[in-house]
Amino acid sequence: MSDQQTCVIDNGSGVVKAGFAGEDAPRAVFPSIVGRPKNVSALIGVDSASEYLGDEAQQKRGVLKIWNHTFYVELRVQPDEHPILLTEAPLSPKTNREKMTQIIFETFNLPALYVAIQAVLSLYSRGRTTGIVCDAGDGLTHTVPIYEGFSIPHAVSTIQLAGRDLTTFLAKLFTERGYNFTSSAELEIVRDIKEKLCFLALNYESALKQSHDSSQFEKNYELPHGKVITIGSERFRCPEYLFKPLEMNGRELDSIQDLTYKSIQECDVDVRRDLYQNIILSGGTTMYEGIGERLLKEIENRAPKSINVKVIASPDRRFAVWRGGSTLTSLSTFASMWITKEDYDENGASIVHRKCI
């Protein structure tokens, strides 16, 4: 299989990242949602496809349609000519893994497949095999402790608080200023504001006081139709939701720092020091300026004083999972890891549990 270029596909909760092994960044990055036009007359002059994949779509697309789009439209490859690495969320049910394996072999006739846990790939992208990955995407935030390349399932923690919740929360904060963003198109504008202007305050109370006393945090944002709006404390109040879900928006969830701390404490005492010293941020919702310093401060307040806590927030962490997959499949030692078509034909979909641990 050395002459066949490997495709690496990271199916995130909100965004698909796809490309080729050995490259530094994915070739294609697109939302994993689909919609059918509600009002066809409004789309006169637009390509009359019955389905649209991208930002304007409202429903999750079936995984089969996403893969079709990935192979034939985005990467422009014939899947039966390429080994494929797919990613999965931690604690994915066995039936899901088998179904994914079955669909991809039987529909696309792949020569070979490997399924890897997203957080493990994030760790590999930083050149590590032990650490705890805090992965915040669009739909979920996970903390996944990993020891010598294997995740520790009983210590994995998840909350349903991530990128889309922060977008909705920022829209709610804007209503207090008299700006109403409610339609899906308007929420896309809010998402853009969030990604471009929001940041984490190291000390929230201090930043809030400063924002009342001065205009130092205020920034202007030009809307598509030309109107300019001003935002101030919303810039740091929005992502504060990750650190104070109850106080900020009345949700009784673990904060991102409690989630991380609890996952570490669930692990054997002998590995905790290694985990505290290798806290890896991953995913688009960890891209806020200041988030690494803030998480470090919060974990240091909880960890034993004898431990030197370290949080790694690499600049490319939005694509950490994809890059880990690109790196892993490029290793010469990886060749024996693939589930080949022959393996699948001989053993069925359950082979995924033996080959992809």
Curated annotation (Swiss-Prot):
**What is the recorded post-translational modification?**
Met-1 may be removed after translation.
Leader sequence range is: none
**Alphabetized Gene3D superfamilies for the sequence:** 3.30.420.40, Actin, Chain A, domain 4
What's the main place this protein lives? cytoplasm
Q: Name one Pfam family in it.
A: Actin
EC number per UniProt: 3.6.4.-
A single Gene Ontology CC annotation of this entry is: cytoplasm
**MF-aspect GO terms:** ATP binding; hydrolase activity
Q: Which PROSITE patterns match?
A: ACTINS_1, ACTINS_2, ACTINS_ACT_LIKE
Sorted alphabetically, the keyword list is:
ATP-binding, Cytoplasm, Cytoskeleton, Hydrolase, Nucleotide-binding
Q: Catalysed reaction per UniProt?
A: ATP + H2O = ADP + phosphate + H(+)
Record's InterPro entries? Actin, Actin/actin-like_CS, Actin_CS, ATPase_NBD
Q: Which family does it belong to?
A: Belongs to the actin family.
Q: What does this protein's UniProt record list under function?
A: Actins are highly conserved proteins that are involved in various types of cell motility and are ubiquitously expressed in all eukaryotic cells.
PANTHER family named in the record: ACTIN
Task: Specify the protein name.
Answer: Actin, macronuclear
Species the sequence originates in: Oxytricha fallax
